[in-house]
Amino acid sequence: MIGVIGVKRNVDIAIREKLALYPKKHKKYVGELLNSFKEVVILNTCNRTEIYFNCTEEISEDEIFDKIFNVFNWNDDLKKYMFLSKEKRAVTHLMEVICGFHSRILGEDQILGQIKDAYKTAISDNSISSELQKMFEIAIACGKKFKTECKMFEVPVSSVSISINSALLKGCRKFMVLGYGEIGKLAIKHLLSHKVECIYLIVRDKSKASDLEGEIVEVLDFNEKNQVINEVDCIVSCTAAPHTVVRNEDIKTEGDIIHIYDLAVPRDVDKELSEKERVILKDIDEISKIDDKNKKIRKERMEEYKHIVEESIEEFLNWLKIREVSSKIRNIKIRENEICSERIKTFSNKGNGENAKLAERMIKSTADAYVNRAIELLKSEALKGSDSSCAEIIEKIFLT
């Protein structure tokens, strides 16, 4: 059984923080999950916590919740904020997620790269091997095709772009970016495409961003951030830290207005900062509610290309159906080879060499024609969901 358990949409950030997973514990999580599930993929982003699983035995929904909650040491009171989808609903969920239909900012395509990373990590961890591997391969192809054909780049959107565009409209020209992961890199790229006065990039390893040092970008270590934090108009924070990185005492009470966009989950910025008159603080939930002129265009365009999602769902479900009869197909081919060998051996004992070779080709060709037709019929009936009676007849003909 294939399934996914994750945080429901529109759950408040205060709850999502409690369900966030820490990357440093990833190996431990996977090892423990594989004690209960055949395959596992963990999708853990700043806005999404989802565990995709495949189990060979039928287990109840309560058991699934208990097993996963025990691994992550989550409080049982948080179960009401989680969803569980199985079989086709789980497949549909992944295909829609990778195309941006479930993103807090509709159409945000960063999720495609995040799912690709989760898949690569699962391959590296040896935590997927069959159904989940195929499902993610089809999903990634679906996401790429959707992104290419939908051409969402013509209507750009992300939490980063919305945050920075909002700050620029408010007159911000001096920026600080905290963190240089995927989101941090997007923030820097976006800022460099606009006329800003200066950018302070705060990182834990300055060597990873040394190529950015230039006229308007200054790379600083985290312990240097407070030297300049009160000089900027805007802070964009997007670290993967499990703790607060911008504390209340870091920002002086007096001074010019400072806009802070906290894109992290758990939150990077002390929420008490919003009580200071000079601070305008927005977390990821508030950022996703900022209306932008492209929202309606994105929604209409995505619906127009929804057929790509539906086709990918059907492709995977058909693969599953064919896979269910694959063992029967293998047995039929094995039996075909055995029968051919017996007939060829019998003929060879009676005829000369030249005739024997010709007979071998004829026997094999005739057997292939009938067996391949039987296999085609079996596959066709499997796709219709009526393969059991067909398989029974074919087994009686070829395997008894």
From Swiss-Prot:
* Top EC class for this record: oxidoreductase
Query: Where NADP(+) is bound, by residue?
Result: 179-184
Catalytic residues of the enzyme: 46 (nucleophile)
Residues holding substrate: 45-48, 103, 108-110, 114
Q: In which pathway does it act?
A: Porphyrin-containing compound metabolism; protoporphyrin-IX biosynthesis; 5-aminolevulinate from L-glutamyl-tRNA(Glu): step 1/2
Q: What is its EC number?
A: 1.2.1.70
Q: Which GO terms describe its biological process?
A: protoporphyrinogen IX biosynthetic process from glutamate
The source's superkingdom equals: Bacteria
Name the residues annotated as site: Important for activity.
93
Query: Which reaction does this enzyme catalyse, per its entry?
Result: (S)-4-amino-5-oxopentanoate + tRNA(Glu) + NADP(+) = L-glutamyl-tRNA(Glu) + NADPH + H(+)
Sum up the protein's function in the record's words. Catalyzes the NADPH-dependent reduction of glutamyl-tRNA(Glu) to glutamate 1-semialdehyde (GSA).
Family statement drawn from the similarity comment of this UniProt entry: Belongs to the glutamyl-tRNA reductase family.
Q: What else is known?
A: During catalysis, the active site Cys acts as a nucleophile attacking the alpha-carbonyl group of tRNA-bound glutamate with the formation of a thioester intermediate between enzyme and glutamate, and the concomitant release of tRNA(Glu). The thioester intermediate is finally reduced by direct hydride transfer from NADPH, to form the product GSA.
Protein name per its UniProtKB record? Glutamyl-tRNA reductase
